[in-house]
């Protein structure tokens, strides 16, 4: 069976950058261009591609902070810090790296990388292609199905946890992938600055979802719910539904694309050589020659 790989580019890059931040500081002190993220991202992806054969591939990137979610809810991701200048200078080289590795890159203003990851996974699913998502973003849990699994980056970049349809419920307190957005609607998501229902924590949210399945059913059955919880649900109803809506990843952005548009190309060894030489990055050739 053919297989596909989709990488949440920003997630991987941020992880790599912060895991090796001292290297970036050292480079700046020596008046050199930081290359810490480039080196770690390159080695990580080379290892993945050299261990498993993929037919199709995509790296999804954020293009801008202003997205349709931010337009609908001004506080969306408002607490996130701007990208570090020591990482910004590495982005053009990272994109060159991805292309030389054979990937197609998708990035579009107004649309988050998550939505392209979801849309790519959905496209692959339609053609029964097994898909692996690489990300540190737990929002991706909602995309897991019989054809799609998530390699969740944990502990910097050194540990990856595989989450699939078989182990999903065990690892997520009994809920299923489609209930991830229901859960976020109730408890919110601090990383995205989604509020959810104030006063409802993970345990209460899980119990509600195990009993009522989704937010709509919870509100239909308010009279059966304990008054202390019911009152919170009533008070923050609008935010519950908004948080759920904003947490949902779009999956229909690539419906008119063809499979062949995402064929993973062989390594372009000449471009890789030139890139690493120009950046004075050594010991990479063993990965691709």
From Swiss-Prot:
Name of the top EC class for this enzyme: hydrolase
Presence of keyword Acetylation: no
Molecular-function GO terms, alphabetical: 5'-3' exonuclease activity; 5'-flap endonuclease activity; DNA binding
Enzyme Commission number: 3.1.11.-
GO annotation (BP), single: DNA replication, Okazaki fragment processing
One Pfam family per UniProt: 5_3_exonuc_N
Annotated protein name in UniProt: 5'-3' exonuclease
Species annotation: Ureaplasma parvum serovar 3 (strain ATCC 700970)
Record gene name: polA
